[in-house]
Curated annotation (Swiss-Prot):
One of its GO terms (molecular function) is tryptophan synthase activity. This is Tryptophan synthase alpha chain. Its EC number is 4.2.1.20. The alpha subunit is responsible for the aldol cleavage of indoleglycerol phosphate to indole and glyceraldehyde 3-phosphate. GO terms for cellular component: cytosol. It catalyses: (1S,2R)-1-C-(indol-3-yl)glycerol 3-phosphate + L-serine = D-glyceraldehyde 3-phosphate + L-tryptophan + H2O. Belongs to the TrpA family. It holds the Pfam family Trp_syntA. The keyword Lyase applies. The active site is at residues 49, 60. Keywords: Amino-acid biosynthesis, Aromatic amino acid biosynthesis, Lyase, Tryptophan biosynthesis. It comes from Nitrosospira multiformis (strain ATCC 25196 / NCIMB 11849 / C 71). Pathway: Amino-acid biosynthesis; L-tryptophan biosynthesis; L-tryptophan from chorismate: step 5/5.
Length: 279
């Protein structure tokens, strides 16, 4: 059983929801990444989404775009990101790590080399933003050969045919983008999220994480009432961006801990569609 499946199985048994923070590899600087990853875990993160820096992050808002730019100034490459995961694995063999990024760096390395290296370094899942599921069969085959979960995005405007395709390809969890637009958007409509998740659960048998627009504990708690996982990215990146270097770890820990506490205060009722048999 994969680390992701094991994690969600334990969470379901304990009637808890996952906290999935996103950070960009190399921001604020490469040498801080592994300590920052460990700090996230100590603060209560269940899964770490690690962004691969890219020069044209079309799905990301200004905050994460700036984060990617800072990492690229340090010349952080995909190889460097994988090395960071490998170093993290030297002292953490249980926390799932999911890479999130764009197709260009992966294709430059090649599917075979990328998936083999990812497996060797301890990557558990990969989400490529600009790979539509309809064109991802070959990509998914390479991932599954290495027991790496292919993770896909769904949104409020995803057509049913695409939902069905994602349901047939995805493993680990599905990332539901709760807002139209780019990362960092505001005005989360929880009623709409609840309705959309109800519809998705009749088709998606793996856990569903919700992200975009989650900026505080109250919203994180409300989303945890509806979803299997809460994904927080832009708010954490903002904390990194505005913190003096010496205070980054402390400030991020404080923020993530507050989100953890809020999520754990949510209703313990497990999400309707996720069963241990699906994990």
């Amino acid at each position: 059983m994969s680390r992701i499946s094991t994690l969600f199985g334990k969470l379901l048994q304990n009637r808890r929801k996952a906290l999935i923070p996103f950070i960009t590899a190399g921001d604020p600087e490469p040498g801080m990444m592994v300590p920052l990853m460990h700090e996230l875990v100590q603060a209560g993160a269940d899964v770490i989404e690690l962004g691969v820096p890219f020069s044209d992050p079309m799905a990301d808002g200004p905050t994460i775009q700036r984060s990617s730019e800072r990492a690229l100034k340090h010349r952080v490459s995909l190889q460097d990101v994988l090395a960071m995961v490998g170093e993290f694995r030297e002292s953490d063999s249980s926390t799932p790590v999911v890479l999130m990024g764009y197709a260009n760096p992966v294709e430059a390395m090649g599917y075979d080399a990328f998936t083999a290296r990812s497996k060797a370094c301890g990557v558990d899942g990969v989400l490529i933003v600009d790979y539509p599921p309809e064109e991802s069969v070959k990509w998914v085959e390479y991932l599954k050969r290495q027991n790496i979960a292919p993770i896909f995005l769904l949104s409020p405007t995803t057509p049913q045919q695409r939902v069905e395709r994602v349901a047939s390809l995805a493993e680990g969890y599905v990332y539901y983008v709760s807002l139209k637009g780019v990362t960092g958007s505001l005005h989360l409509d929880l009623h709409d999220v609840a309705e959309k998740l109800d519809g998705l659960r009749s088709r998606i048998s793996i856990p569903i994480g919700v992200g975009f627009g989650i900026r505080d504990g109250a919203t994180a708690r409300a989303v945890a009432e509806l979803a299997d996982a809460v994904v927080v990215g832009s708010r954490i990146i903002e904390e990194i961006e505005r913190s003096p270097k010496a205070e980054v770890l402390t400030n991020v820990h404080r923020l993530v801990k507050s989100l953890r506490i809020a999520i754990d205060a949510a209703s313990p009722a497990p999400s309707a569609a996720v069963k241990l048999t699906h994990l």
